[in-house]
From Swiss-Prot:
Keywords, comma-separated and alphabetical: Hypotensive agent, Metalloenzyme inhibitor, Metalloprotease inhibitor, Protease inhibitor, Pyrrolidone carboxylic acid, Secreted, Toxin
Name the record gives this protein: Bradykinin-potentiating peptide 13d
Transmembrane segments: none
Molecular functions (GO terms): peptidase inhibitor activity; toxin activity
Modified residues (Pyrrolidone carboxylic acid): 1
Keyword flag Glycoprotein: no
Signal peptide range in chain numbering: none
Length: 13
């Protein structure tokens, strides 16, 4: 609502 949904972060190796 106040914060925009962040894009999915790929898992680091």
């Amino acid at each position: 609502q106040g914060r925009a949904p962040h894009p999915p972060i790929p898992p680091a190796p």
